[in-house]
Amino acid sequence: MKETDRKAYNIVKPNSFGYNPARINVGSIGYYSGAKDIIVSSLYEIFQTSDNIYDRFLWHWFKSKQFQNWIERLQEGSVRLYFYYDKLCECEIFIPTVDEQIKIGNSLDRLDNLITLHQRKYFLIFHNIR
């Protein structure tokens, strides 16, 4: 790809978070766990965590009501509200030890998987009754 073509994109490395600052209020945040670099629109904020953060723990915090409250408090703009990376860095979160983050993140993953399983079972039962 030509150098000039890359200006419209951000490179996303494995184990990175990315979000649209104008759409994060509706959950527009993702995590890339692939093996190779990819590109996304330059409109997205891309970041990686430090070694003292377990990404799955942070992922669940991003999906929490507490994080939504931070977005509502810190977003800025008039017609369209934005939540840029500098505002994300202003959010306050209690960070337990990495071992505790792993336990919490894994427990929440298991709970999410259990909920998904029951939703699928309900869907199959509901559609077979009709």
Where are these regions (language model features)?
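Feature detects amphipathic, helix-rich regulatory segments
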Residues: 1-130
